[in-house]
């Protein structure tokens, strides 16, 4: 589960600057949900190989009414969702009444709170930050968010202990040179495939409020008549519900929470961005639910973007399809083709969660997506497919030399990662990379999951070596030198 960091503080202390620094906003998803989360923004950040979620809260004013209203309506919710709270203060402006009021609220929360003095560039940090120790929240950390000074060290301290148990990904560095590789044991690959097939499929139901997440969850559970209970260890109100269908085990991750029967028809659902983002990271397959009558919104695209960024398998359910006119149905299908053309690997189902129409077919696509994302494929098969792709459409020329593809192997799963080794492969045009991706997808029959391809240029294993001639070669060379000298006379 991704840890969550909340940025709290009065206006203009640099929360948004730090947020952008951590999330690298141009490269990472930044989900802004106006009207649903008020002024809170959510983004994904990364330090080395460790990822976490950042919440940027709105500023809190110093008046008593503003403190109570905004803290209760916005920042207090962000603090409740967070594993660590970064309380930002302005080192240049000094401590204010608003800072003291916020500190009073934070002391009442059972959270890890870190006082972060921003804008310490160009000043004596120890001197200007000394007064903030009076807030009674412990150590004061110095940063300059705009320049990135001290940010990394501060985050490492705040999230210390959260990544101790993170499993390391498989290391494929032994295949780097490409001189030789050991073919995988087909029996071991098959055994691993069978092991994964026996595991429950973790399926996250995500979507905007009121698209029918709870209705679909209860429809699925009602059809199967299973016992509903919460698995121990779940956090932040996401409900993990075990169930089975046709001898296949599932764990439904319901970000909206399971509703009692009397509340199924409620028109308003609680929406938590944090629960949704964490469910995406924790699941195997994402079921994105879209309201057919509203069409595709920017919020749908934000959720879709986070799903693709996480590399999760994807199935799309267009809900509330019943009762629509043929004209409206064609209009919705046209919009889907236009706006979702870049995810042609995901299957789209038109359903009615309320009446159960089309719900049964979702399982087939979910299983296909899971099996595709965890498919174990040998190096020989991947290399053979790569060779066929190059034979059907030769790699382009780079300068006076043609790009050469040497071999391919699996680099990871969920999503499938294919590593291609060769010469000048990093100079391949994006169009040819897409061609290879689509060729692998068709050849392997992979649907419902993105494929990632990584290109590696093998180093010359003989670089830096000096040729050592055998005695016989030395004798021949000496004779050639003598002959060359005689011919000049």
Swiss-Prot record:
Gene3D superfamilies: 3.30.300.20, P-loop containing nucleotide triphosphate hydrolases. GO terms for molecular function: ATP hydrolysis activity; GTP binding; ribosome binding. Keywords: GTP-binding, Nucleotide-binding, Repeat, Ribosome biogenesis. Residues 3-166, 201-374 form the EngA-type G domain. The keyword RNA-binding does not apply. The keyword Ligase does not apply. Signal peptide: none annotated. GTP 1 binds at residues 9-16, 56-60, 118-121. Pfam families: KH_dom-like, MMR_HSR1. Residues 375-459 form the KH-like domain. GTP 2 binds at residues 207-214, 254-258, 319-322. GO terms for biological process: ribosome biogenesis. Belongs to the TRAFAC class TrmE-Era-EngA-EngB-Septin-like GTPase superfamily. EngA (Der) GTPase family. Associates with the 50S ribosomal subunit. GTPase that plays an essential role in the late steps of ribosome biogenesis. NCBIfam families: GTPase_EngA (TIGR03594), small_GTP (TIGR00231). This is GTPase Der. The lineage of its organism: Bacteria, Pseudomonadati, Pseudomonadota, Gammaproteobacteria, Alteromonadales.
